[in-house]
Amino acid sequence: MAAKKRKKKRKNSKQVKRLKIELVGLLLIFLAIFGSGAAALSDGAIPGWLENLFQFFFGIWYFIASVFLLVTGFYLLVKRKLPDFLHRRMIGFYILLAGVLMLTHIQVLESLLVTTENTSIIGMSWTLFFDYVNGTGTLVQTGGGMIGAILFTFSHYMFSITGSKIVVVFCLLIGAIFLTNLSIGEVASKLFARVKAVSNIAIEKWTQYQTERRERKQQAYMDDESRQAVNESEDNMVTEIEVSEREEPFINDFTDVAYQNNATQATENKSPAKQAQSIKSDQEGQSDHSAEDSKDEAMPMTARENHDYELPMPDLLADPSYNSQQQEKSQIQATVRKLEKTFTSFGVKAKITKVHVGPAVTKYEVYPEAGVKVSKIVNLHDDIALALAAKDIRIEAPIPGKSAVGIEVPNKEIAMVSLREVLDKTWSNKTSKLLYALGRDISGEAVVGELNKMPHLLIAGATGSGKSVCVNGIITSILMRAKPHEVKMMMIDPKKVELNVYNGIPHLLAPVVTDPKKASRALKKVVAEMERRYDLFSETGTRNIEGYNEYIRKQNLASEDQQPHLPYIVVLVDELADLMMVASNDVEDSITRLAQMARAAGIHLIIATQRPSVDVITGVIKANIPSRIAFSVSSATDSRTILDSGGAEKLLGRGDMLFMPVGSSKPTRVQGAFLSDEEVERIVDHCVEQQKATYQEEMIPEETNEVVEDVDDDLFEDAVQLISEMQSASVSMLQRRFRIGYTRAARLIDAMEDRGIVGPYEGSKPRSVLVPKPTEEQTTSS
């Protein structure tokens, strides 16, 4: 019992001690608040008296006492214990504060000690303080307060005024060392290192500035000497426009670039037999065994190499007609003057420095002066078209990689670009099997693409704009570069007229699919093939089709059992809109899966449509097909649907396109290569003669024969009789007449559709009734 009382007593004593500490903390906070500036807010005696008390001891530094009391009070409230006032950092604070107070007092009383006979520092400080309290003096006269006065008195007696200043310096240094725990040597070394680093940077910048200045002077001197020589060399490459009193723009005809190597290419293409023999030997060198040495159980969706197969030669294509735009050059001078006059009349300071004459359009490079907004030139679109009397112009602002704005004006006549002249530029490149030719850009350079790098392509444009010719050019380019065992194709043509010419070529996996319902099943089979290929990659530890084929090649070298390589698969859909109308969900799901995952499996999509609306080219399809080609469309909305930007509505048609491959920020204007139907037939006939088509059974979309089951509903016969009499079919009518629910009525309508009694669902239109209305005799007998 006594122990319990002692324990309770100790506990109470600890509680009382904590309460005392908290009360002391609150008291210190009270003194800090009312001792520093509270007199300005309150007219009471205590705030003013406390403030004067702090000023008496600390002078102009009286707020330090308030801060010290405030921090100490909060410390007591939070920690509930007394702080260590003799800590090393606290000692440093005391020494530093003493030095500051003494220094302030020296500055105040130094002049008075020299001019007056009274040398009592404490007496003078007392007098100055009460002068401030009575209103005849200022707070600055109090200096460091009575603490500063006492310290200065002792120091002045020991060391005089000069010695006191030295004491102050040492007090500040010693206090800083105690407070920061940094030695003077460390501070000096760090300061020296920082000054040295800054000086080195300054010296380096100055040296670099001097070097650049000398280089600029030297370059300016060289430019002055070589400008004449450069102008002479450029005059040999371009045609000059003789316009007086202004700078002459350079004119670059696309024929200068397109046809500069015609003689060399013609010589190389005169001996197709030799090229075919070399190609054949190269292909034979890559394979060690023929098809007879293969395993009995061949892997599905693989093809054995036919060593007798010869690729089509460029001679099967029509010879290019080297057209030029010489008739356009006589009008360029007048066009340049009209453009500059238009700019001047609207207050736009700009110069035309270069002119590129392309197959279909002429591009004028306009260099605006500093301070001219690009939008000001773009807003002159209609005025420029009016001044040039052009049916439409296109403004490219700015030209990528140049500080210029491009104005594209249609030519009076379009120079035809043939597929052969574009393929001649790339015929030496045999490694890429999926390289295809598109046409020529404004500068005359051949524009080609590699489908395996895109990896999918979306082609859209209005009817008659050149979309089908572009698709035929892509297919022909692949047929002329790849053998059937290297590239396979799946063609879907709901229009039944565009791709049927390719039926029978050995590259096809299945006959050209023309039924939209079969097309959705064909796409599902391609998805299944993609998944099967990924299973093969997983089993062999490879990541893509190139790695898998390399793995098979190494296995074939080490083993007698020869395994075939996986071919690339190109899926062509000529009209996506028809497929989306019949089976939009299945088609979109299959295309989305292929676009997301099929690249590594060697499966690539080429999707063409003549209706570029958002319900056909959905956001999901666009997001997964980054490479796009836009032909002429009717509105800027359709252009934005294809390219995410305008411009396609200003194209001229007849193969004029905007090509935006993956990774490109802006589309490139290209004049598409023309390919006639006769040329396509010659290429197809050559491929069929070399090897007959062997379709893959597992890739042919099968027919679905749905067995119509009997309807287990007593109202079916009555519903059929009602619909035949009314010659109108709807779910709501059956609900009202027979007083049944929606589900049962909809099931009856579906059963009638399966049996050919009513037509299919046509949106807001009523279903058509396919059975005739019964006669009065039939109604009476029933």
Curated annotation (Swiss-Prot):
Notes concerning its domains: Consists of an N-terminal domain, which is sufficient for the localization to the septal ring and is required for cell division, followed by a linker domain, and a C-terminal domain, which forms the translocation motor involved in chromosome segregation. The C-terminal domain can be further subdivided into alpha, beta and gamma subdomains. The alpha and beta subdomains form the DNA pump, and the gamma subdomain is a regulatory subdomain.
Keywords assigned by UniProt, alphabetized: ATP-binding, Cell cycle, Cell division, Cell membrane, Chromosome partition, DNA-binding, Membrane, Nucleotide-binding, Transmembrane, Transmembrane helix
Protein name, as recorded: DNA translocase FtsK
One Pfam family in the UniProt entry: FtsK_SpoIIIE
UniProt topological domain (Cytoplasmic) ranges: 187-782
Alphabetized PROSITE patterns for the sequence: FTSK
Species whose genome carries this gene: Oceanobacillus iheyensis (strain DSM 14371 / CIP 107618 / JCM 11309 / KCTC 3954 / HTE831)
Membrane association type: Multi-pass membrane protein
InterPro entries: AAA+_ATPase, FtsK/SpoIIIE/SftA, FtsK_alpha, FtsK_dom, Ftsk_gamma, P-loop_NTPase, WH-like_DNA-bd_sf, WH_DNA-bd_sf
Bias kind Polar residues: ranges: 264-280
Keyword Cell cycle attached: yes
Gene Ontology annotations for the cellular component aspect, listed alphabetically: plasma membrane
Entry annotated with the keyword Magnesium: no
Boundaries of every FtsK domain copy: 444-640
GO biological process: cell division; chromosome segregation
Taxonomy of the source species: Bacteria, Bacillati, Bacillota, Bacilli, Bacillales
Chain segments carrying region Disordered: 264-300, 760-782
Listed transmembrane segments: 21-41, 56-76, 90-110, 143-163, 166-186
Subcellular location: Cell membrane
Sequence similarity: Belongs to the FtsK/SpoIIIE/SftA family.
Function: Essential cell division protein that coordinates cell division and chromosome segregation. The N-terminus is involved in assembly of the cell-division machinery. The C-terminus functions as a DNA motor that moves dsDNA in an ATP-dependent manner towards the dif recombination site, which is located within the replication terminus region. Required for activation of the Xer recombinase, allowing activation of chromosome unlinking by recombination.
